[in-house]
Amino acid sequence: MDENISKLRDMVAGSDNIVFFGGAGVSTESGIPDFRSVDGLYNQKWKYPPETILSHSFFERYPEEYYRFHREKLVIDGVKPNRAHLRLAELEREGKLKAVITQNIDGLHQAAGSRNVLELHGSILRAYCSRCHKPYDAGVINKGTGVPQCSCGGVIRPDIVLYEEALDDDVVSRAVHYIRNADVLIIGGTSLNVYPAAGLINYYRGNKLVLVNLSETQCDSYADLVIHEKIGEVFSRI
């Protein structure tokens, strides 16, 4: 494993066009549960399965139940960026990292100092009215009770992509641009099972595809470098 980390270190040292594509595993070391891990949200007992609650149709039909789940399970106070977030921000400041493309909704990349962050699934730190689209601070949702209402009478919702909803076209287009033009593409902390987001990596045309994940993924067989370690540990060594 030390040899593989050394190879990754050399790749990073020799490139100024790195793109990072990350998932829930990037934030687990900050105390945010991974949806699909053994201890993740999808394995915790609830009245409805989490994937049902986090769907557009459920939100429309049972907003009270959705917000109860949202405040109890998605809003986690006191979380801070970990070693992976901080090192990625450093690489951007050094002019090496061009973009962070994340499936996470926690805002920890920005908290670490990263500036060019493409949030495929939105952010729990933003909110807007589902009727008039007026923007709101997420505190209206996260620190409130019941179903938050806009002055127009519409329901205020978090600026996240729920199941059954499409990804933002502009964010996807920018992500494709960065992946397609990357010299080094590092994929970290994701099982690559969430589509359409996971399909974006197919746009990579280079020969330095790196996978950093605790467990195996469907892309391990054609990656140029695979490291099965905690992502914070790996990034602290590059």
Tell where the protein language model's regions lie, with residue ranges.
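Conserved catalytic core of sirtuin-type NAD+-dependent deacylases
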Residues: 1-238
